[in-house]
Curated annotation (Swiss-Prot):
Region Disordered, annotated ranges: 1-31
Organism: Cucumber mosaic virus (strain Trk7) (CMV)
Family membership noted in the UniProt record: Belongs to the cucumovirus capsid protein family.
The UniProt record lists the keyword RNA-binding: yes
Family matches, as InterPro entries: Cucumovirus_coat, Cucumovirus_coat_Asu_sf
Entry protein name: Capsid protein
């Protein structure tokens, strides 16, 4: 007896028949996943080779030590002639300097280049005698004595330099917040005149946590 015409056989053959478009849909999904992976890889490569102008904060780039936080100040160097220097002492907010005995562990400088940046600058931070007037002669000597790290930051035709950070470790010096007024950020414009709207410096001072006022302002 031929069972091919039975109801059960008809249902089986119907179940085995593939749905229209199922193979093409799965193929499209696989292609989309592969394209997504390629785009993610390309974005990661571009992020390394062509950094954006908005660099991460201290907290975003490196975690603070346990029990520490950081205070940021912004410096905008003025116009600096070719071969000349700029120096500015660190000035933290009063809400921080009120706790002048809190320990400072590190100072980080982040260079944020503005669209007009096309120069080469040397940047450092170091302890400066209170008697120093931060003259060109005094700053020149400080760059050459090797007592603090120096970041050389320059324009590149393919994009701005990826390494935009200088980290100065003060742990062994037992520095505190009160000592920060003795430190200065120094900038040297090497190849040409640095215009006042070419770079912004973000200075992050990592220090022990300070109490937070819970009183509303009057």
């Amino acid at each position: 007896m031929d069972k091919s015409g039975s109801p059960n056989a008809s249902r089986t053959s119907r179940r085995r028949r593939p749905r229209r478009g199922s193979r093409s849909a799965s193929g499209a999904d696989a292609g989309l996943r592969a394209l997504t992976q390629q785009m993610l890889k390309l974005n990661k490569t571009l992020a390394i080779g062509r950094p954006t102008l908005n660099h991460p904060t201290f907290a975003g780039s490196e975690s603070c030590k346990p029990g520490y936080t950081f205070t940021s100040i912004t410096l905008k160097p003025p116009e600096i002639e070719k071969g000349s220097y700029f120096g500015r002492r660190l000035s933290l907010p009063d809400s921080v300097t009120d706790y002048d005995k809190k320990q400072v562990s590190r100072i980080q400088i982040r260079i944020n280049p503005l669209p007009k940046f096309d120069s080469t600058v040397w940047v450092t931070v170091r302890k400066v005698p209170s008697s120093s007037d931060l003259s060109v002669a005094a700053i020149t000597a400080m760059f050459g004595d090797g007592k603090s790290p120096v970041l050389v930051y320059q324009y590149a035709a393919s994009g701005v330099q990826a390494n935009n950070k200088l980290l100065y470790n003060l742990s062994e010096m037992r520095a505190d917040i009160g000592d920060m007024r003795k430190y200065a950020v120094l900038v040297y414009s090497k190849d040409d005149k640095l215009e006042k709207d070419e770079i912004v410096l973000h200075v992050d001072v990592e220090h022990q946590r300070i109490p937070i006022s819970r009183m509303l302002p009057t």
